Amino acid sequence: MEGGYEQGGGASRYFHNLFRPEIHHQQLQPQGGINLIDQHHHQHQQHQQQQQPSDDSRESDHSNKDHHQQGRPDSDPNTSSSAPGKRPRGRPPGSKNKAKPPIIVTRDSPNALRSHVLEVSPGADIVESVSTYARRRGRGVSVLGGNGTVSNVTLRQPVTPGNGGGVSGGGGVVTLHGRFEILSLTGTVLPPPAPPGAGGLSIFLAGGQGQVVGGSVVAPLIASAPVILMAASFSNAVFERLPIEEEEEEGGGGGGGGGGGPPQMQQAPSASPPSGVTGQGQLGGNVGGYGFSGDPHLLGWGAGTPSRPPF
C-alpha cells in the first residue's frame, strides 16, 4: 500500500507540476505572441486598403487639374513641362534689353525745306535758270547766297533823296558793263500760279577797283563763269495779304468818321512812277567814265566827283 501510495503520490506530484501556473504561462506566451503578429499584419493590410482609395482620388484630382490647364488658352507647354501647375511670375529675363526696331520715315513732310546747291553754267541766264527750275519742280526756291562772276548786269535802283529833302533822281534801271564778282545774291523765285512780282533777286557786286554796287536784278543776269547758288526749296506756300481782313474792316469803319477823308487802307500813291527795262533811254548820261548808263545820282556819286577808271 505504501508502494502504491508512493506511486500514486509521485504521479500526483507529476500532475501537480503540470498544472503549475508558470508552465501555463510559458505555454500560452508563444501562442499569444503569434496572435499579436497576426493582428498587427491584419491591421496593416486594412490601413493600406484605406489609403488606396485616397491615393486614387488624389491622382484623379491631379489629372483633372492638368487637363484643365491644357484647355486654357494662355497655358504654355514649355512652362507646363518645366513646372507643372505653376505659371511663371514677372517679366522674362532679357526682355528689357531687346533692340527696338528703328523708326523709318518713308516720305517727307510737304512743308519741309530741302537744301540745294545749284550750279549755273557759263553763258546762262541765272534768273531764267532758277525760274525754269522752280516751274518744273513745282516748288518755290529761296536763294540764300551765291558766288561767281557775272557780266553786263542790269539793276533797278531806288530813289535817292536830294540835299533839300526832295527827290534828286528818279528810280530807274542801270546797266553795268564788264565783269563783276558776286558778293551777295538773295531772293525768292515762285512757280506759277504765284502773282507777278511776288519774287525777285537782289545782288551786290564788286568791281575791279573795289567798288561795290547793288540793287534788284533785272533779267538777264549772265554768268561769265560757273556760278554756285545755295538755295532751299519749299512747297505749299500760302500767299496772304497783310493786314488781314478784320483789320481792314476796323480801319474802314474808323476812316468813315473822319469827315470824308480817304480810307486808311487805300494804297498810297507811289513817289515815282515805276520804270521798266525799256526806260534806259530816259537815263542818259555817264558818270565819270564808268561803263554804265543812267542817272549819276542813282549810285550816290555826284556829278562833281573826279573821273575814275572803269571797272
Curated annotation (Swiss-Prot):
Disulfide bonds: none annotated. GO terms for cellular component: nucleus. The keyword Nucleotidyltransferase does not apply. One of its GO terms (molecular function) is minor groove of adenine-thymine-rich DNA binding. Residues 178-183 are annotated as: Required for the binding to non-AHL interactors. GO terms for biological process: chromatin organization; flower development; innate immune response; leaf senescence; negative regulation of innate immune response; photomorphogenesis; vegetative to reproductive phase transition of meristem. Pfam families: PCC. Residues 110-258 form the PPC domain. Residues 40-105, 246-311 are annotated as: Disordered. Disruption phenotype: AHL27 and AHL29 double mutant exhibit a long hypocotyl phenotype in the light. Homodimer. Interacts with AHL12, AHL25, AHL29, TCP4, TCP13, EF114, ATAF2/NAC081, histone H2B.1, histone H3.3 and histone H4. The PPC domain mediates interactions between AHL proteins. This is AT-hook motif nuclear-localized protein 27.
